[in-house]
């Protein structure tokens, strides 16, 4: 009888802990989704309030970037693209203006989806980052506004949830690659070693 009671208590306690973790994860996921939706809305409004002709001017684009940053310091840089994927103007620390993005996965996606939030990728800057891009319709056809989200700021947002003294929060994409850095170790875009275990646990719950 004692063995049965101990086993039942251990199982009951474990189930409680797992449900608490799931509830915390769901709540934090909603917070992250809201953050990304707000930044996409900022970018969409900025594009709708201007034009390709205006934002192709470096000063006009710099003014827009200042307005974006006044809403959120999570914006790291911004660029404007024509309908062929040419990077017409850029505000940020990299030399990206004039480059051709027509074959980039994010550019192909935003042509179809109107708003696109990427996974972490390297791109021309050869550094892990992710972007939000929006499509806008102009007199001469569609054009695109793209902003990079500050990786450290986003990482801090994801890590802001605390689960006990040793728990941690991080994001992985559908392929199981780290999208934020775990405190326990691991680099952006590396495979998460426990990804298959998480998938199995989720299937058992559902």
Question: Can you say where each PLM-predicted feature lies in the sequence?
Answer:
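Juxtamembrane extracytoplasmic/periplasmic/luminal helical "stalk" adjacent to the first N-terminal
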Residues: 1-57, 66-76, 116, 129, ...
């Amino acid at each position: 009888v004692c063995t049965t009671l101990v086993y039942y208590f251990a199982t009951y306690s474990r189930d409680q802990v797992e449900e608490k973790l799931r509830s915390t994860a769901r709540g934090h996921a909603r917070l992250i989704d809201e953050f990304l939706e707000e930044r996409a809305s900022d970018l969409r409004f900025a594009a709708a309030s201007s034009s390709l002709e205006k934002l192709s001017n470096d000063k006009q684009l710099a003014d827009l970037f200042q307005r974006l940053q006044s809403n959120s310091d999570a914006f790291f840089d911004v660029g404007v693209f024509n309908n062929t994927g040419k990077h017409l103007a850029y505000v940020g620390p990299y030399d990206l203006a004039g480059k051709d993005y027509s074959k980039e996965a994010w550019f192909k996606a935003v042509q179809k989806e109107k708003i696109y939030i990427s996974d972490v990728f390297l791109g021309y800057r050869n550094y892990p980052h992710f972007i939000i891009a929006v499509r806008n319709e102009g007199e001469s056809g569609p054009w695109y506004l793209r902003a990079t989200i500050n990786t450290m700021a986003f990482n801090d947002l994801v890590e802001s949830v605390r689960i006990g003294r040793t728990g941690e929060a991080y994001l992985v994409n559908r392929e199981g690659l780290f999208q934020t850095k775990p405190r326990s170790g691991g680099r952006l875009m590396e495979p998460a070693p426990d990804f298959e275990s998480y998938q199995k646990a989720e299937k058992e719950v559902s």
